[in-house]
């Protein structure tokens, strides 16, 4: 797993990569990139790829091997405070949720919401998380798609 600041500079992940590898389902094979970005950058990405003008918490961009996750650090810090757990725990919740989107799960599809919720519950329990993202009353993140090259360029802007 490669973790960056959204501008191509590597940053420490605080054990997020090891944790995610331990809880990920077997179908999650390949390379995963994670970018931590500001709320303003996330708002711009959300507007560009989903036509929603607000900073969401996590976006998932499927790629050739697995894909990329973009996590808004400000949103994550606020959600951690509101949920009563640590920032690191919130990053795990968001990374797990985003990974499920990369694997094809979609809670915005009524036919798939229950399937995604069940998988999220199973994996978060495996990873020692008490709460998942689907069960919370927050603005729902969703998968967004783009070509790998334009995606990487968009994240670094």
Across the structure, where does each feature detected by a protein language model lie?
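An acidic/histidine-cluster motif and surrounding catalytic segment
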Residues: 1-92, 100-157
């Amino acid at each position: 797993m490669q973790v960056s600041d959204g501008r191509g500079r590597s940053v420490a992940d605080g054990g997020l990569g090891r944790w995610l590898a331990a809880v990920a389902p077997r179908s999650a094979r390949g390379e995963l990139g994670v970018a931590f970005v500001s709320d303003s950058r996330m708002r711009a990405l959300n507007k560009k790829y989903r036509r929603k003008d607000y900073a969401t918490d996590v976006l998932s961009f499927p790629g050739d091997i697995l894909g990329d996750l973009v996590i808004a650090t400000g949103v994550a810090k606020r959600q951690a405070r509101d949920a009563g757990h640590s920032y690191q725990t919130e990053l795990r919740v968001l990374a797990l949720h985003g990974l499920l989107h990369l694997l094809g799960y979609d809670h915005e599809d009524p036919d798939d919401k229950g399937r995604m919720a069940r998988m999220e519950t199973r994996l978060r329990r495996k990873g020692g998380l008490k709460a998942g993202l689907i069960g919370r009353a927050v603005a729902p993140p969703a998968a967004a798609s783009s070509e790998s090259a334009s995606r990487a360029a968009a994240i670094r802007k």
